[in-house]
């Protein structure tokens, strides 16, 4: 992970996002030592997420060298965490990762790496995350993630037209043409 991060940084990436997507599902924390090692060898912003369940986890990751912390499942289960984190550390370093999935003709929020469909509707959750203090949204369409046929443009347009904070597109890229 450290060598890949260094490679991306030296190759011109303008930001690096390291997500341990199985951490929440496996009920474990993100590897702090890896974050520390990566932060030492790159010169671009580093966003870290996965297994973040409370304010202490966010503080630990920022202290380890992360510039931003991404929260997903914990934010859905405890939305107040977004407010607490943004008040303590500033909204500029709080990224709410949202995994969206089409379910029964609606766009729903899923958690635990896409394994659990919640009752939250995607657009409502994005608006709520912003109102609670998220500085960015990392939007992943679970319908296109891993397929490599391009982003879910429809889902992204609906989210970006309903919030004013930056939305990072994730899930579906297979070639440069998808950008």
Stretches found by the model and what they are:
Residues 1-9:
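Short catalytic helix/loop segments, enriched in acidic residues and glycine
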Residues 8, 16, 48, 61, ...:
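Conserved, mostly hydrophobic/aromatic
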């Amino acid at each position: 992970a450290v060598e890949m991060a260094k490679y991306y940084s030296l190759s011109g990436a303008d930001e690096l996002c390291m997500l341990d997507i199985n951490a929440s599902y496996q009920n474990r924390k993100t590897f702090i030592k890896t974050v520390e090692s990566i932060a030492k060898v790159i010169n671009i912003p580093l966003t870290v997420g996965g297994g973040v369940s409370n304010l202490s986890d966010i503080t630990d990751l920022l202290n380890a060298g992360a510039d931003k912390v991404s929260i997903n499942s914990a934010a859905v289960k405890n939305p107040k965490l977004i407010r607490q984190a943004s008040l303590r550390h500033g909204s500029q370093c709080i990224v709410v990762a949202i995994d969206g999935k089409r379910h029964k003709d609606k766009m729903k929020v899923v958690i635990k790496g896409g394994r659990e469909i919640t009752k939250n509707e995607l657009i409502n959750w994005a608006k709520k995350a912003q109102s609670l203090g998220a500085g960015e949204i990392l939007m992943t369409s679970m319908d296109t993630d891993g397929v490599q046929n391009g982003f879910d443009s429809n889902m992204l347009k609906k989210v970006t037209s309903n919030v004013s904070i930056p939305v990072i597109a994730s899930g579906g890229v297979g070639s440069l043409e998808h950008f």
